[in-house]
Amino acid sequence: MTIPDLCNDLVDEILCRVPARNLKRLRSTSKRWNRLFKDDRRFAREHMHKAPKEYLPLMLTSEYRICPVSINLQGDVPSVVLKRELSLPDPDYSHQFDIGRVFHCDGLLVCNHVGKNPRYGSKIVVWNPLTGQTRWIEAGYRWKEYEVRFVLGYCYQQDENNSCSKKIYKILCFYPNGQDTEIYELNYSDRWTRTIPDGDLTPGWTLIYSEQTVSMNGNLYLFASEKSKPHLGVSLLRFDFSTEKSSLCVTLPYQRPRYEILSISAVRGGENLSLLLQLDFESKTEIWVTNKIDDTTTKGAAVSWTKVLAFDLSPDLQLFSEEVNFLLDEDKKVAVCCERWLEPQEHHRYQCRREYKITDKIYILGEDNKVDEVGSGEGEATDSLEGISQVILNYAPSLVQIEQAGGGKTKRGDD
């Protein structure tokens, strides 16, 4: 018996257990399968729950492009290779969209351009790189500034018959000070709303390291310190997209008012958080992972951390700054760390602004203070400090559908 001889329900049940990237290769097998993978929301939901998770490291380069990353940790000499950039055509212009910032949640990327070029207006895009689906959103000219953050999360809502829960995706837009916060709901609205009281993202708290945010189980985690008790140090706050409030407080392994380096990432399929930190005035750098976060209370989370890596690096190496990003391989006890260096160039009298040479550096750090520099690339000189932060993230390919405003069909880019 071959697959065409099986009933459709059984075929769908089998395909629900095939990794998403493999399904993309099967789209040309039949018209029915193509429609199933592209347009069937029920199948996409089933696939999300039943298919094995896979991860594809992606990097935002100094050329404002998203590139898949091949990481080889086998053998004595590890390597990191950037592959061909992913295509994201600008719908209004005959060129690729320049990505200044990117945030990942649930197989979707939310990207925005940074800079003052008026041709871009203030568009942002929600993008599924696997399927090519996009939704372009007008964010308003007040959100053109580089400092603004666009992040993505979700909550669940019962359908009209209370028979099943539907994921509701929302974009949160905020400034580094946590003010002027607005929310855009992808499923139902086509406008930004300030549902958060007074537009304050973290009432009673001060945002710290606002570049460092991560999504876990649809919620947003970000660093903050309590205004009335700054001596208690930096904690993690959880923004819950169902209540649209910041509430849950997660203590860090050390209670310090500030750190030399503090970076956050998601591990274990987005079910746990990992933390790269270096205490103030110390050379020792550590990576910790949460074992469990008890989020049944809004007063504060019961959390346990496990230290998985520790390095005591020479200060002469100067590997990290506050802008470092990292991915952790728990099994191999290895971290891939990326950051972007800006070297001021000679400033001539006729130049209005100083130029900087951009250099991207990638390191692999293992046990016993082993450091391998496996990637280094120079970008074009720039006279702007906008969009300088390099980002590496663990993208989880999925078939999740992006709903258009008014319930229209999803737009697709190049496959």
Curated annotation (Swiss-Prot):
Classification via CDD domains: F-box_AtFBW1-like
Residues in F-box domain copies: 1-46
Domain of life, source organism: Eukaryota
Induction: Ethylene treatment has no effect on RNA, but down-regulates the protein levels.
Pfam families given in the database record: F-box, FBA_1
Annotated knockout phenotype: Slight ethylene hypersensitivity.
Role this protein plays: Negative regulator of EIN2 protein stability.
Subunit description: Interacts with EIN2 (via C-terminus).
Something else known: Double knock-down mutants of ETP1 and ETP2 show an accumulation of EIN2 protein and a constitutive ethylene response.
Protein name per Swiss-Prot or TrEMBL: F-box protein ETP1
Naturally occurring in which organism (per UniProt): Arabidopsis thaliana (Mouse-ear cress)
